[in-house]
Amino acid sequence: INGHVYQFRPGQTILDVAQENNIDIPNLCHLKGTRATGACRVCIVELEESWGKKLVSSCSSPAKNGMIVHTESPKIVEYRRFYIGLMLDSGNHNCDIGASADESWTDFQIEAMENEQKEELCPVWGDCELQALAYRYQVKGRVSGRHREPVKVPIETDNPFIVRDMSRCILCGRCVAACNELQVNQAIDFGFRGDKGKITAGTGTTLMNSSCVFCGECVQ
């Protein structure tokens, strides 16, 4: 990995080996103890084969003898920036407030800091993995270059424990894995298809009217 040789155990993935050796491969969908999905595409790495190079998801690709892996090649960075941009572009992610296609990265940062106290900013501003990756790879969202109005989705507030704002969801699937594989409550799952996809409770109802026991595993 990145020019260094590492030992691995049968059953480990590339991401497992990297994390065990303090090599940072960013990821948004992987949750330890659950099945890898590769849904976010942020953990992709470049794998050298005898016939050339290819991109693979490190969270779902088994480690093998003789693998040559690059985690931050120019091609990898380009792809990560693209996927992060798509996620920022897909919902109401106000960490890229004021961004535009022709705005410099420095100007964007200054404008974002000036807007930091605005009420419409995301409640987890400054404590968000997606935002951290956007800053790390200098992604402002709006991949198409066109301004898109924030997604308007009713906020689910009918219970005192968990408030659900699906306009912030990037469909990483961590909450689904936590509910179905760690707690085995089977209260939430992926629903609908394409750009209408979202995390649903029961038969499309609210958490309050589903089999959710409000253990909090999905939030953690």
Language-model segment annotations:
Residues 1-215, 219-220:
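Ferredoxin-type iron-sulfur electron-transfer modules and their immediate structural context
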